[in-house]
Amino acid sequence: MLDVNKFEYMKIGLASPEKIRSWSYGEVKKPETINYRTLKPEKDGLFCERIFGPTKDWECHCGKYKRVRYKGVVCDRCGVEVTRSKVRRERMGHIELAAPVSHIWYFKGIPSRMGLVLDMSPRALEEVIYFASYVVTDPGDTPLEKKQLLSEKEYRAYREKYGQSFQASMGAEAIKKLLQDIDLDKEVAALKEELKTAQGQRRARIIKRLEVLEAFRSSGNDPAWMVLDVLPVIPPELRPMVQLDGGRFATSDLNDLYRRVINRNNRLKRLLDLGAPNIIVQNEKRMLQEAVDALIDNGRRGRPVTGPGNRPLKSLSHMLKGKQGRFRQNLLGKRVDYSGRSVIVVGPNLKMYQCGLPKEMALELFKPFVMKELVERGLAHNIKSAKRKIERVHPEVWDVLEDVIKEHPVLLNRAPTLHRLGIQAFEPTLVEGRAIRLHPLVCTAYNADFDGDQMAVHVPLSAEAQAEARLLMLAAQNILNPKDGKPVVTPSQDMVLGNYYLTMEREGAIGEGMVFKDTDEALLAYHNGYVHLHSRIAIHAGSLKNETFTEEQNNKLLLTTVGKLIFNEILPNSFPYINEPTTENIEGRTPDKYFLDKGVNVREEIRKRELVPPFKKKVLGQIIAEVFKRFKITETSKMLDRMKDLGFQYSTKAGITIGVADIVVLPEKQEILDEAQAKVDTVLKQFRRGLITDEERYERVISIWSAAKDKIQDRLMKSLDKRNPIFMMSDSGARGNASNFTQLAGMRGLMANPAGRIIELPIKSSFREGLTVLEYFISTHGARKGLADTALKTADSGYLTRRLVDVAQDVIVREEDCGTDRGILARALTDGTEVVVKLEERLVGRYAHKTVRHPETGEVIVRKDEMITEDIANEIMKAGITEVWIRSVFACNTRHGVCKKCYGRNMATGMDVEVGEAVGIIAAQSIGEPGTQLTMRTFHTGGVAGDDITQGLPRVQELFEARNPKGQAVISEIDGTVISINKTRDNQYEVVVQGEVETRTYVAPYNARLKVEEGQRVERGQELTEGSVDPKQLLRVRDITSVQEYLLREVQKVYRMQGVEISDKHIEVMVRQMLRKVRVIDAGDTDVLPGTLLDVHQFTDVNAKALREGKRPATARQVLLGITKASLETDSFLSAASFQETTRVLTDAAIKGKRDELLGLKENVIIGKLVPAGTGMARYRKVKPAVKKETASDTVSSK
């Protein structure tokens, strides 16, 4: 068996007839499959045992030799070799074709490769191959030309005129003869000569032909091999035939297709032997050609061959294509053993790193481990009896199981796995029942809830796998979200509500103003009912033993509440005592204003002070982030568990519920509505008098009602009691928001109709009052649209993620430092005046490219190639610096990846990124995962510019696919001044820009809004009208940096509008992949062809070589490819073929004789190697774990 880890690369090419025969174990001569009586394979048929090997292990066809001892014997009676039946998966056969047949991929693909080699049009080829015309293969001394097509009539006429002095024939044989006559070197030289003078379409055609001919020349493939003399037959186990229960047979479509080929081939042989008339033979040859076409790619030409029920048969090409094809179904994703799935329920008492595994599931999953342990403990004599014990569920089995699963992590996965936190490792604890218990805090990462979600369990078997699960995938390790480095395990819902309730303050609560000597005394008073959780009390600060208190503070009284005392117990000792939800308190220390001198009238002080707001969800997130920053992982996960317990405990104690009585309708609502109605009437009057247009009237009415709703919302929120349960739920961030509440108690507001246009009659009722029938009907439109949108969005977002992963899958951190001399100048990303991403957010976790000094004092804030931490970023902001040179993925020189310095911090760990980290995939997941949260809608801005601005998911796709945007802006191609703006007859604007050298006139389309005025200076690439810039045009007019900046800013804009934060570096990784190719314009003296796409690094190599040899280097222009196109242009044909357009990619690769160097992740998954990222990188592979534990697979195989 071939060891996957031994080979370096994989090569694909065309197979010569000799090669096909050398693969084969014998010729398939009959179309029979298996004998209907004996159910054994027919001799020389499609399942023949003599060719493909025995159907039963170690047994020949006739039964003369049985058992292993005859291994390798070839039976003298039936000719079958005695061996394993597994060989029927690998042994091939062949069919000797009676006439050559063209391979449809090379003749029919676009562009037709055969057509390019022969310089014939695909139409002409088709006529020859399918016996409609003759082609002259050798004109002899006649005036005919080689490759000239002749109809039947012309052929006869020329035959009579010239006799045998010329040769013409039809079918694939003629094409084969022409292909054999081609002298590649001569042809290439002639074309290169012609290329020097050619222009226009002729030039493009020559370049295309040169590309194919060069490919044949350099790969050593013979063009004549595009025509088949021998057809390989794939192993029978790969096109099985199985008996169904009713005695009928189910068979793979390939067998039908092979049968047709064999039948027609045998008929053709017979006709040739009989010397049948030419016309009959030709017809049979054409049918054979069509049968082979159908076998290779059914439906590519003409109507597909159909099976029973008019279903097109699946040919060899279809076996590879699409989601159900070999690549995506079986190679990139396989079903695995040692796995199970079940419904999840909440496990509130679990630790962060634990999950509850149902007993029977655990027993099944860990069966081999349990069996081994039973034998070792002497509880069973051998594996067989151990197995029997487990099947009968002996009581002692459970004790053994308990011990086996200790310290053995399992992986839990919830589909859809949108990012790497969709699979995490936990230590299992056995639970009764049949449901998996999940820790409530990891739900956010999985996006799980307990309304019937299911999860899958996988058991890592080997010692290495267990070590990786424990060290890298344990849930307690994955606290930060890879997309923005913020904690992903923030408490939600009940937990938030409990902690909010716990930290509330209330005026005049029982026991207000009491002073306690320490926490225990305060808790005692609380448990005995002398003081309430919300009572503001004082406590001796020294008794808290908090390390952040100063000596002076320790001698004072701390003003706080009982609830806050309880809350602060969960925090580490050296953490500030949190008394108010402010950044200063969380990141710095407890503010002085809460410390009172001893002997002060505490009650008096309390009365003077405002109430401190309770801790909301955001604050809890801040606390977690700060604890993580100071104390790292173990401490954080312990604190999270304690926070969770507090939350559940106090939300239960609070007993917060909602009833209809909690929804208080606003008394002055009617006044507000009447006022708005009066305004609307005024607008209508103006419209009737013709003072305003219909469109303006519509706009105004809508803004009046929106303002009315906002006013109601405002009043509602102000008039609400702070202890109203609904208010508490929404204010704490547990569930619901202000707008939900307005709909319950205020008014529902404006609704959209099915077309997405807002209906100008608002819904004036709230849910509390009840809607009228019409109001109810109107509001159903929006509800339905919402559901339909969500369904569409999920599919779209998933496909976007797939394309992103594909284009960036080979971006891995490959080295420490690439030594680049470039960086990028980071400023705050702005859109007009609005800041999209603040400068400090862009700086944190990056390396400085140049030393940054304080502008006034000149002292060094951060040196070159030093990491910018949060503190340094704050210093930079305080110094008032607005732009900083940083190292960036954009400027990284590493091949096939990035280096540590250019990437900076790994967002998921908060540390430097490790060599081997698959940052490309992390980037793709970080951009794709929030995709579902982006809206689908294209907003109607209304008004004069009735132009749609694409936003949300479609805008992200438009940017990454580098499409021409909707509502494209006109941009200036030169630096200069706007000298005039004129309106033309058909309402278009003409903008004239005068530069130093030339003057350009730009016509802005009808109803575009201008962004410039006369006399204004404009730069190249500046927008003259509002709208989105076409990045390809920007690249042509300006430089690569402005395109990178533009794409980064635009993508960030879409996500930030939806409140999703993504680190810049993820978008940078993607944009870099889109810009990694150049198109050659002038080849100079190099071997590259003009118009070809090359990798930037390849191009530099080619030029470096040319310069060394004193030749003229090539010139090229940077191109921007959309992610789909970039994926298909990758160097790896395995990766491209498994993505899209499988047949085109493979055809192309085969002709070029491409080598796949197996650098990316996909290629290695496909061939079954360890991925070359993380611990699978060559540099780590030599490291062997010291533990020698027998793995489960050893145990199983020893049965």
UniProtKB/Swiss-Prot annotation:
Catalytic activity: RNA(n) + a ribonucleoside 5'-triphosphate = RNA(n+1) + diphosphate
Membrane-spanning parts: none
Cofactor note: Binds 1 Mg(2+) ion per subunit.
One of the record's GO cellular component terms: DNA-directed RNA polymerase complex
Top-level lineage group: Bacteria
Binding site residues for Zn(2+) 2: C818, C892, C899, C902
A GO MF term: magnesium ion binding
Co-factor requirement: Mg(2+); Zn(2+)
One Pfam short name: RNA_pol_Rpb1_3
Record EC number: 2.7.7.6
Biological process terms in GO annotation: DNA-templated transcription
Residues engaged in binding Zn(2+) 1: C60, C62, C75, C78
Statement: the UniProt record of this protein carries the keyword Nucleotidyltransferase: yes
Alphabetically ordered keywords of this record: DNA-directed RNA polymerase, Magnesium, Metal-binding, Nucleotidyltransferase, Transcription, Transferase, Zinc
UniProt binding sites for Mg(2+): D449, D451, D453
Its biological purpose: DNA-dependent RNA polymerase catalyzes the transcription of DNA into RNA using the four ribonucleoside triphosphates as substrates.
Family according to the record: Belongs to the RNA polymerase beta' chain family.
Protein name per Swiss-Prot or TrEMBL: DNA-directed RNA polymerase subunit beta'
Organism (species): Geobacillus kaustophilus (strain HTA426)
Gene: rpoC
